Regions:
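A contiguous, basic/glycine-rich beta-loop/short-helix subdomain that forms a polymer-engagement track
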Residues: 349-369, 374, 385-392, 485-601, ...
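Mg2+/Mn2+-dependent nuclease catalytic core
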Residues: 67-181
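A substrate-engagement module of RecA-like helicase motors
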Residues: 206, 212-213, 265-374, 382, ...
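Signature of the SF2 helicase/ATPase Hel1-core->accessory helical subdomain module
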Residues: 253, 356-373, 377-480, 560-575, ...
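Conserved helicase motor "Helicase C" RecA-like lobe of SF1/SF2 P-loop NTPases
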Residues: 634-658
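Metal-dependent nuclease catalytic cores that hydrolyze phosphodiester bonds in DNA/RNA
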Residues: 1-95, 99-110
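Conserved pre-motif I regulatory segment
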Residues: 200-242, 255
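Conserved RecA-like P-loop NTPase helicase motor core
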Residues: 597-609, 658-771
C-alpha cells in the first residue's frame, strides 16, 4: 500500500536481526559450513515442528511477539515469533480477567518459560553454555512477554537439537524482569544510531526523489517505456519488456523505479544482471541521477573471488587477517562508510574495507543492508544457496522492486542454479582422502558409491532416467552429516578445498531434492571425460523463480532479445505478466539485413566445399567497404575450418577469439576496434561467447556483424531431455530446447552493430534455415525488410547499401 506523508514513521526489525547485528563479534570462519544452507533450514523447520508437537498442552508454538519503542521522530517496532512459550492457559486467562476488572497483576500467580529451539548438524552435547546471540534472541522474547503480562520473573530455555541424531541438550536460566529490562534497553540504545540514520536518510531520499526529473530528452518511444514500467510497478505486476538496443532501457527502468519508491510503491531496488559490463552501466546511471540531485544510496556487489585481497581465498582467522576479528570492527566501519557518499562500487568498497581491516566482501554485503539500490548478479536474489539472506530469509516478503537486465540469460542461469550434479569419481576421491578419519564417514561414502555403481551398470546406452531416489537422498544426507562432523574438527590437510566443494554439492543436492516438482528430471550418464554422473536437472525453472519473485513487490524483465516473449514468460514466472515491445529509435535505412540462402551449418552439409562457400560470403561482404567486422561462428572448430579458406592479404587483418581468454586478453582483443586504421579488421568470434553480447562498439568501430549458422545448441542429453519434457507438455520441444536458445544467440550477436542513432552497418545471417518460418517467426520486427542473397551477389548488394549511405552524406 502506498505510504502517506501524514503517517507516523515506523521502522521494523526482527528480534533475530537485531541481536545478530548488534551483538556479533569474533572471526569469519568458513571451515564449518552448512549452518545457513537451505537444506539445514528445511531440516530445522521439520525438527521445530516435531518438538513443538510433542511438547504438551502447555506448550504454545510460534507465538508472535511485538514491542514498540517510541522516539520523537518515529516508532521502532521489534517483532518476532518465539519458537515456544510454556505456560498454563488458565493462569493467563485469570491474569487477563483480573486486568480487565482493574485488579493488580501483582496478585496473580503466573509462570512462563520461553523456549528457543536451534537445530544444527554440530554435536550439541559438546556445548557447555548457550551461544550468545541465541540466548539474546530468547531474552528479547522473554522481556517482551514479561512486559506484556507484568511478570516479575520469567524462565528462558535454550533447546539445541542435532538435525541427524535428534539428540537434545537444554540450558535453562531464570531472569527477573528488572534485569531483562535493563539488558533490553541497553540493546536498543546500541541500535538507536542506526535507526536514526535510516529515518533521516529516507526523509532526505524521498525529498530528493520528489524533485527528480528525467535526466535526458526523451527519445522516440522512451517516455512510453518509462510509463509502462512505472504502471507495472504500482500495480505490483511482472512486466516483460522487449527493448531494442538504443532505446535507453537502463535509465528507462531505473528512473520509473526510483520515482515509484518516492511515491511509496517500494523501498529498495535490485538491479540484476549476468554481466559485469551491464552492472557498470547501471552504476553510471545511478551516478547520473545523483548528479541531478538524487540522494539514494547505491552499492554494486562484486563476487567474492573478485574482491578478495588474496590470490587464494581462505576465509578463516588462521589464513586471513581481515577474517580475524572482522565482526568486532565491521559495524563501526559500515556506519562511517555510509557517511562518505552515495554510489559505492567495487574499488570504493575495497579500499575502505582494507583501510578498516575488514573482509571487503562481507563488508559490502553489510553496506547493502543500508542502501536503497543494489546492483548485483542474478544469484544474489534467485539462488537459494547464495541469495542475500538479510533480505530474502525464509518467508519474508519485502518492499523490493526487481529490475532484471539481459533477462534472456536468466533461463539457463536459473536451470544451473536449481540443478546439481554428483560425480561418482568425486565420491570415491573424497572417500579415499577421508578413509582414516572415521569408519562411519567411510561407510556413508561407500553406500553412495555403491548406489551410483548400480546405476552405472544399468546405463548401457546414452543415459538412464530415474524416478525413485529416496535411498540415495538418505545416503547423501548421512554422508553430508559425517563430513560436517569432520569439518568441525578444523583439521588442516591437503585437498581441503575439494572436500568442501564436495560437501557443498551434497548440501545443494539435499536442498534441491526437498522441493522437487514437475519441473525436474533425474538421470545418470557418462560425461565427456568418461566419468559417471548423477544429475538432478531443472528443466523448467519457472516455479522456483516465482518463489523468489514473490519475495518482492514487482518485477521488470527486460532485454533487447526477449523473443518469442511467450517462451520467456513460460520459463521465468508462473503468474500472468504484462508484455510490451518498445519501439526502436533507429532509422532502418541505416541498417541492412542480408540472409544467405546457399549455405548451412547443418552437420550433414559440413564439408570443405561448404566451409569455402562461407569464406567466400565473408570475403565478399568485407570487400564492399573497408572497416571493422565481427564474424560469429557456432564453435571454435567451425571457425578454424572457415579460417583456412579465408583470403589473406595485406588489406585486411584477421584476429581470432581464443578459448578461456583472460580479462587482459579480452581487453587487448577489443582495443583493436579502437585503433585508427586504413585496412579492414575481421574478428572471428564464437556465438554466445564473451564478445557476442554486452560490448558497445559505436560509430565506425564496428560496421558489420556476420552470423554463421543458427546458433542451435549441440545435441546432448540435457537438450534431448528438455525436448522430451516440452513435447510431453504440449509444446514444440525442438523450438524450446534448440531453436529459441539458438536464435537468441543470433540476435544478441547481431545487436553488436548499430548502437547509436548515428551508426550505420550491415548484418548478414548466413544459413538457409533463416528463411524457414519457425526461424523467421523469432525475428524482431526491425528485421522484416531483410534481403535474400547468395555468395555471388552479396558483394553487389553490400556495395549498393554503402553507396546509398555515401550519397546521403553529400
Amino acid at each position: 500500500m502506498k505510504e502517506t506523508a501524514e503517517e507516523r514513521k515506523t521502522l521494523k526489525i526482527s528480534v533475530r536481526n537485531l541481536v545478530e547485528f548488534i551483538l556479533r563479534s569474533g572471526d569469519i570462519d568458513d571451515r564449518v559450513g552448512g549452518a545457513d544452507s537451505m537444506q539445514a533450514m528445511q531440516a530445522g523447520a521439520r525438527i521445530h515442528r516435531k518438538l513443538q508437537k510433542r511438547a504438551g498442552s502447555d506448550y504454545h508454538a510460534e507465538v508472535p511477539l511485538k514491542f514498540v519503542v517510541s522516539y520523537d521522530e518515529y516508532d521502532l517496532v521489534i517483532e518476532g515469533r518465539a519458537d515456544g512459550i510454556i505456560y498454563d492457559e488458565d493462569e493467563l486467562l485469570t491474569i487477563e480477567e483480573q486486568a480487565s476488572d482493574g485488579v493488580s497483576s501483582e496478585q496473580a500467580v503466573f509462570s512462563a518459560t520461553i523456549d528457543e529451539i536451534k537445530g544444527m548438524y554440530q554435536d550439541v552435547m559438546a556445548y557447555d553454555e548457550p551461544i550468545l546471540v541465541h540466548l539474546a534472541q530468547a531474552k528479547c522474547y522473554a522481556f517482551i512477554f514479561a512486559e506484556k503480562y507484568s511478570l516479575k520473573s520469567i524462565d528462558v530455555q535454550m533447546t539445541y537439537v542435532n538435525l541427524d541424531t535428534e539428540e537434545i541438550k537444554q540450558f535453562t536460566e531464570s531472569f527477573t524482569f528488572e534485569a531483562l529490562e535493563e539488558w533490553f534497553q541497553n540493546l536498543i540504545s546500541m541500535y538507536k544510531k542506526w535507526s536514526d540514520f535510516e529515518i533521516e536518510h529516507k526523509k532526505i531520499r524521498q525529498e530528493s526523489i520528489a524533485k527528480l526529473e528525467f535526466p535526458f530528452e526523451y527519445r522516440e518511444g522512451q517516455k512510453q517505456l518509462v510509463s509502462d514500467v512505472y504502471r507495472s510497478i504500482i500495480r505490483e505486476k511482472i512486466l516483460f519488456a522487449q527493448a531494442p538496443t538504443g532505446s535507453g532501457k537502463t535509465i528507462s527502468t531505473i528512473f520509473p523505479a526510483v520515482k515509484a519508491v518516492g511515491e511509496g510503491y517500494g523501498d529498495r531496488i535490485f538491479y540484476l544482471t549476468a554481466k559485469n559490463v551491464t552492472r557498470v552501466v547501471a552504476r553510471d546511471t545511478f551516478k547520473i541521477l545523483e548528479e541531478k540531485g538524487y540522494e539514494g544510496k547505491t552499492v554494486l556487489i562484486t563476487a567474492k573471488d573478485k574482491i578478495c585481497p588474496h590470490d587464494e581465498r581462505k576465509c578463516n582467522p588462521d589464513d586471513c587477517p581481515y577474517a580475524k576479528g572482522h565482526f568486532d570492527r565491521v559495524n563501526d566501519a559500515v556506519y562511517d562508510f555510509l557517511q562518505t557518499g552515495n554510489v559505492f562500487d567495487r574499488d570504493i568498497v575495497y579500499e575502505y574495507a582494507i583501510q578498516r581491516e575488514v573482509c571487503p566482501f562481507e563488508f559490502c554485503l553489510d553496506v547493502s543492508s543500508w542502501c536503497d539500490n543494489i546492483i548485483c548478479d542474478y544469484n544474489y536474489v534467485f539462488d537459494p544457496n547464495v541469495c542475500l539472506k538479510r533480505f530474502f530469509a525464509e518467508g519474508i516478503r519485502g518492499d523490493y522492486l526487481f529490475l532484471v537486465d539481459e533477462a534472456h540469460n536468466l533461463v539457463e542461469r536459473a536451470r544451473n542454479m536449481y540443478s546439481v550434479t554428483i560425480v561418482k569419481e568425486d565420491v570415491l576421491f573424497v572417500k579415499k582422502i577421508l578413509k582414516n578419519y572415521g569408519k562411519n564417514l567411510e561407510r556413508t561414502l561407500e553406500r553412495m558409491n555403491k548406489t551410483l555403481l548400480g546405476w552405472k551398470k544399468e546405463c548401457m546406452g546414452n543415459r538412464i532416467m530415474l524416478d525413485d531416489i529416496d535411498v540415495f537422498i538418505y545416503e547423501a544426507m548421512n554422508a553430508a552429516s559425517e563430513i560436517e562432523k569432520f569439518l568441525e574438527k578444523k583439521i588442516r590437510m591437503e585437498f581441503q578445498e575439494e572436500i568442501l566443494d564436495f560437501y557443498f554439492t551434497l548440501r545443494d543436492f539435499l536442498s534441491l531434492s526437498e522441493g522437487m516438482g514437475e519441473g525436474y528430471r533425474i538421470y545418470c550418464d557418462f560425461m565427456e571425460n568418461g566419468e559417471f554422473a548423477f544429475h538432478l536437472y531443472c528443466v523448467d525453472p519457472s516455479e522456483r523463480l516465482q518463489e523468489r519473485l514473490n519475495r518482492g513487490r514487482a518485477t521488470v524483465f527486460f532485454s533487447a532479445t526477449l523473443l518469442p516473449v511467450n517462451y520467456y514468460k513460460k520459463l521465468l514466472c508462473k503468474e500472468e505478466p504484462y508484455a510490451i515491445y518498445a519501439k526502436s529509435i533507429f532509422d532502418p535505412a541505416k541498417r541492412r539485413i542480408f540472409v544467405g540462402n546457399s549455405v548451412t551449418t547443418k552437420y550433414t552439409r559440413r564439408s570443405a566445399k561448404e566451409y569455402e562457400r562461407f569464406a567466400k560470403y565473408i570475403d565478399n561482404i568485407v570487400s564492399a567497404k573497408i572497416g571493422n567486422y565481427m564474424v560469429f561462428f557456432p564453435s571454435y572448430k567451425f571457425m578454424e575450418e572457415v579460417l583456412f579458406y579465408m583470403n589473406m592479404n595485406k588489406d585486411r587483418e584477421i584476429i581470432v577469439q581464443e578459448s578461456r581468454m583472460t580479462e587482459d586478453e579480452r581487453d587487448l582483443f577489443l582495443s583493436k576496434f579502437e585503433e585508427e586504421r586504413s585496412n579492414t579488421l575481421i574478428a572471428f568470434c564464437v556465438m554466445g561467447g564473451v564478445f557476442s553480447e554486452g560490448i558497445d562498439l559505436t560509430n565506425e568501430k564496428l560496421i558489420g556483424a556476420i552470423i554463421v549458422g543458427t546458433g542451435l545448441p549441440q545435441v546432448s542429453n540435457e537438450r534431448e531431455i528438455l525436448k522430451d519434457y516440452f513435447d510431453s507438455n504440449g509444446e514444440n520441444g525442438f523450438l524450446f530446447s534448440y531453436l529459441y536458445p539458438g536464435m537468441n544467440k543470433v540476435e544478441q550477436a547481431a545487436g553488436r552493430v548499430i548502437r547509436t542513432t548515428e551508426d550505420v552497418g550491415i548484418v548478414a545471417l548466413l544459413d538457409e534455415r533463416f528463411l524457414f518460418s519457425d526461424y523467421r517467426n523469432t525475428f524482431p520486427r526491425e528485421w522484416e525488410d531483410f534481403m535474400v542473397c547468395n555468395e555471388e551477389n552479396i558483394k553487389d548488394a553490400a556495395l549498393d547499401f554503402w553507396s546509398e549511405q555515401s550519397s546521403k552524406k553529400i
